[in-house]
Amino acid sequence: MKVLPAKKVEGVLSVPPDKSITHRALILSALAETESTLYNLLRCLDTERTHDILEKLGTRFEGDWEKMKVFPKPFAEPIEPLFCGNSGTTTRLMSGVLASYEMFTVLYGDSSLSRRPMRRVIEPLEMMGARFMARQNNYLPMAIKGNHLSGISYKTPVASAQVKSAVLLAGLRASGRTIVIEPAKSRDHTERMLKNLGVPVEVEGTRVVLEPATFRGFTMKVPGDISSAAFFVVLGAIHPNARITVTDVGLNPTRTGLLEVMKLMGANLEWEITEENLEPIGTVRVETSPNLKGVVVPEHLVPLMIDELPLVALLGVFAEGETVVRNAEELRKKESDRIRVLVENFKRLGVEIEEFKDGFKIVGKQSIKGGSVDPEGDHRMAMLFSIAGLVSEEGVDVKDHECVAVSFPNFYELLERVVIS
């Protein structure tokens, strides 16, 4: 698909529901003691995998993704292996859940997911008493023999919300308390939701302490996904004739790293929280920002914006001076090696960028000429290059653009709504 330069970008929009929160709402409602009602769930390939696995384990769902009733039942051992598709969140969070049930399960995924490391969840869950068998002890497919678990104190080697969540979910049914200590703070949806559901959870800095507990069903409305909004917010800042407002979007402080970095760069940007419903929800406004300054992304913000970091490179193209991202080696372990895919494709578009093992550096005030790019089936990279096309000189041809359906099925539809060509 060829994305051509836009004359003007303007509009008020709401983005699809939050993917991270949808996964957790589905899982926690299946673990609750009584029924739950969930509103505004994101239906995409990743969240369908979580839903289908829970259904195969015995959970009953009624209604559609706009309003879903969830009737939990004790999990029963499934006969078939459980398919996680392309979803790392499904795999890692469900590993934590399944580790705490005395039954045998097998998780498998597509070719991309089968290359992503799972040792990081296997290790703490084995310390708690579960048994795992995986390809090279690190990759899917992965067999889990659940057990009655014991709580542990665990220092995660990387700041990862998925690893932290896997251990906390396992800890719900363990004997004794579970403690997770991270090297830096990662997104906190799991502990925030558990605390709101009455589970004894204490958070001090990067340390989370959880006591085993049961909880009742709940009602929740999922806010818009800040990671999806990010593409439009960045477009609003770098396009020479733009004004964009995103409403009903989640503004959890562990997810607003990109907004903080854009402020540091001098973007014409503001956001406000308008309501709290288990999670803060609000509005983001952005307009053309001709005086962007390059920035070294502060290390503590890196885990809070891991999915948005490649967009910083796009901001850096139009900023004055150098923009540097380091300590982000985690980007190489996503749906693609995002550092390599970013650098290779930016060079194809005529942008000079330097690659590091753990990040990249870009010198500003360049232009994006245009050309053809291959996001390698990675939904976030496909969306990034589409935004690049709108601010390019000649347009950008995005190969395999349909992969955006992994997280944002109506991305191009919303883009057409704000673009005036």
Swiss-Prot record:
One of its GO terms (molecular function) is 3-phosphoshikimate 1-carboxyvinyltransferase activity. Its main location: cytoplasm. It is found in: Cytoplasm. Pathway: Metabolic intermediate biosynthesis; chorismate biosynthesis; chorismate from D-erythrose 4-phosphate and phosphoenolpyruvate: step 6/7. GO terms for biological process: amino acid biosynthetic process; aromatic amino acid family biosynthetic process; chorismate biosynthetic process. It is an enzyme of class 2 (transferase). Catalyzes the transfer of the enolpyruvyl moiety of phosphoenolpyruvate (PEP) to the 5-hydroxyl of shikimate-3-phosphate (S3P) to produce enolpyruvyl shikimate-3-phosphate and inorganic phosphate. HAMAP family: EPSP_synth. PANTHER family: AROM/DEHYDROQUINATE SYNTHASE (PTHR21090), PENTAFUNCTIONAL AROM POLYPEPTIDE (PTHR21090:SF5). This is 3-phosphoshikimate 1-carboxyvinyltransferase. It comes from Thermotoga petrophila (strain ATCC BAA-488 / DSM 13995 / JCM 10881 / RKU-1).
